[in-house]
Amino acid sequence: MTKPSPARYRTTNWFSYNAALRKRGSLLIWLDRAMSWLAPHEGRLGRPPVFSDAAIQFCLSIKVLFRLPLRQTAGMMVSLLRMAGLDWPVPDYSTLCHRQKTLAAQFLYRRVDGPLNLLVDSTGIKFLGNDEWQARKHGVQRRRQWRKVHLAMDAATSDIRAVEFTPGRDGDRPILPELLDQIPEDEEIGTVTADGACDARRCHSAIIARRATAIIRRNGRLWKEDCPAARARNETLRATRHYGRAFWKRWTGYHARSRIEAKMLCLKALGERIAAKDPDPQTAEIQIRIALINRFNALGTAEIVRVA
């Protein structure tokens, strides 16, 4: 029996996508001349901050984008503002280090008409320990530590809508409800696609509470509880057993989950490890990476169709 020929795909918007890729290399797409660079005076006791959160996030975005230490980041900011013709003061490396611990980085996203279809997955990212080649060649010389990044992506726009940053030992089940809580209540969620690690009562209950449909691979037996989450899961499990898992994946579009796995590669393209060593700066660094990825998506993405 001969194997079927592999599918062939074609990019339909190559001209605009090529222009978007060129724009990603421009430094000025990150600089908004209308941003509030200096922090407003709030009238509180103590010394007020000099720079706004937007200014600190912009400086740290340049740091993450070019993988620079803090001192080199401050020097590059001086050159960048001089090129733009802006006479703005630049925070030093000590200010960037302290403000990163308390920064709540903001990342923009695009909203589309209709229900929101979420793709959920997680990956590990290293912040301490030897590199892979050094560990394989010479052995592990010190303890290697990881953190876990949980993402929820919009299937229509490929923008990251929610992110959580946890220790490496934490599982996916407690985090899925927290990801759904980051979606505004007035925004309708259509489906939530995740792997079998989220096949838990807590996850199904959180999805049903948002009036969404769970597309999660089922690995266990039927639940005996009589609740909306259990009934929806049991019906899917019966359909999987009757028609087969391959048909269920095609019917529900479960294979779209591979797109969130590809987005993990985009996240690690900005660095296989995170530079910060403390949890709060690490969270800010991951959020800044998400902001960079969403900004790249806003410039333009490839539209690929199957031709054969």
Where are these regions (language model features)?
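Polybasic low-complexity intrinsically disordered regions
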Residues: P40-Q57, S61, L65-R71, G75, ...
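Residues that form generic nucleotide/phosphate-binding pockets
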Residues: A20, R99, Q106, L179, ...
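C-terminal domain-tail junction helix/linker
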Residues: P6-R8, W14-R22, A276-A308
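Inter-helical turn/loop segments and adjacent helix faces that build the functional surface
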Residues: M83
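Short, solvent-exposed helix-loop connector elements
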Residues: R44, K137-V140, Y243-A256, A269-Q287, ...
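Basic, low-complexity segments
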Residues: M1-L45
